[in-house]
Amino acid sequence: MDLVALKFIAIGLSVLGILGAGLGVANIFSTMLSGLARNPESEGKMKIYVYVGAGMVEFTGLLAFVLAMLLMFVA
């Protein structure tokens, strides 16, 4: 197998990080909605932690995207 094929396989595998970020954010917000349905008074406390957690998960997805772009155009 030549190096170009291996490069595109690596790009495809790095896109799985973006998929994981999407699933992580969906899990965070579905858990938040489930918690708010059980205890609506906790919205103020829960909202801050949810946004921080979603930001961290999205950052990992952004890193996977940047890695894929670096592999595609630089390597």
Curated annotation (Swiss-Prot):
One Gene Ontology molecular-function label: proton-transporting ATP synthase activity, rotational mechanism
GO cellular component: plasma membrane; proton-transporting ATP synthase complex; proton-transporting two-sector ATPase complex, proton-transporting domain
Bilayer-crossing regions: 8-28, 54-74
Mode of membrane association: Multi-pass membrane protein
Alphabetical UniProt keywords: ATP synthesis, Cell membrane, CF(0), Hydrogen ion transport, Ion transport, Lipid-binding, Membrane, Transmembrane, Transmembrane helix, Transport
Site residues (Reversibly protonated during proton transport), renumbered to this chain: E58
InterPro entries associated with the record: ATP_synth_F0_csu (IPR000454), ATP_synth_F0_csu_DDCD_BS (IPR020537), ATP_synth_F0_csu_sf (IPR038662), ATPase_proteolipid_c-like_dom (IPR002379), F/V-ATP_Csub_sf (IPR035921)
Subunit structure: F-type ATPases have 2 components, F(1) - the catalytic core - and F(0) - the membrane proton channel. F(1) has five subunits: alpha(3), beta(3), gamma(1), delta(1), epsilon(1). F(0) has three main subunits: a(1), b(2) and c(10-14). The alpha and beta chains form an alternating ring which encloses part of the gamma chain. F(1) is attached to F(0) by a central stalk formed by the gamma and epsilon chains, while a peripheral stalk is formed by the delta and b chains.
This protein's name: ATP synthase subunit c
